[in-house]
């Protein structure tokens, strides 16, 4: 399985995301550019330039018309996917940590960091109402006084958002009323990443407590646990098989103070039903920060602390593989 190596960032990758068709791969890093690549051959299609700080998150809508990015320059920006033109600049008081389009692509949500005396907020803006963008006035802002949001995704049908917090809590916020519909605490440390399954019925979390867990999207019921011996930075669910892929590794500042075993940086494949690991893919020099499955399930990509993105196309053996418990 020879990867395609994408070199378009000078700093470590923060998030990677495929569009729904899977022909484009969007990557952001701790440098100010948002890159878009052809996923089939790794050719760079272009960049979205405008941010002046590290970009923490990126999302693309259902029909690949708009791209959303959130950055440490205290702004969330909306781009025209095809031309790279900036359509909207939404300024905030602190860094934008997570962002996302709802199912229809009409409503965006983004969350800001708790820093410099400012509270963590989740903001919702309806793109059909130009005054909300011009006046930078979200139709709803939910304060998170307890613990800041470190990852968030839209739930099924755009009815709510699922947010993971620094203290390991998972909250479900209603996109209509802003109330907390559901709240659980299955992780003991920060939740680094949340990704939903293709049909939005389940989602998988990745946490600093060295586990990744599978939950029901509607009830937040805990289904499965995938254990590792190092912090998990990202996890993704295969759209065609009962597989999840986990990526992580020790933070750069802790590497010298821990045993060498924890410093390993492979992508690890687990079977969902049996919670068993069945494969590993080496490659990155440093921790893996973000993972994404291609929507057709025939390849996956990983972005690492080394600033590279790798696109891996699975070998034929992967598709013939039968898991025996």
From Swiss-Prot:
Matches recorded under InterPro entries: eIF3i, WD40/YVTN_repeat-like_dom_sf, WD40_repeat_CS, WD40_repeat_dom_sf, WD40_rpt
Cell location: Cytoplasm
WD repeats: 8-47, 50-89, 144-183, 186-225, 283-324
Gene Ontology cellular-component annotations: eukaryotic 43S preinitiation complex; eukaryotic 48S preinitiation complex; eukaryotic translation initiation factor 3 complex
Protein's UniProt keywords contain Cytoplasm: yes
Signal peptide: none
Record's keyword terms, sorted: Cytoplasm, Initiation factor, Protein biosynthesis, Repeat, WD repeat
Keyword set includes Protein biosynthesis: yes
GO terms of biological process kind: formation of cytoplasmic translation initiation complex; translational initiation
Pfam families: EIF3I
GO MF terms held by the record: translation initiation factor activity
Top-level division of the source organism's lineage: Eukaryota
Role summary: Component of the eukaryotic translation initiation factor 3 (eIF-3) complex, which is involved in protein synthesis of a specialized repertoire of mRNAs and, together with other initiation factors, stimulates binding of mRNA and methionyl-tRNAi to the 40S ribosome. The eIF-3 complex specifically targets and initiates translation of a subset of mRNAs involved in cell proliferation.
Subunit record text: Component of the eukaryotic translation initiation factor 3 (eIF-3) complex, which is composed of 13 subunits: eif3a, eif3b, eif3c, eif3d, eif3e, eif3f, eif3g, eif3h, eif3i, eif3j, eif3k, eif3l and eif3m.
PANTHER family: EUKARYOTIC TRANSLATION INITIATION FACTOR 3 SUBUNIT I
Family: Belongs to the eIF-3 subunit I family.
Annotated protein name in UniProt: Eukaryotic translation initiation factor 3 subunit I
Gene field: eif3i
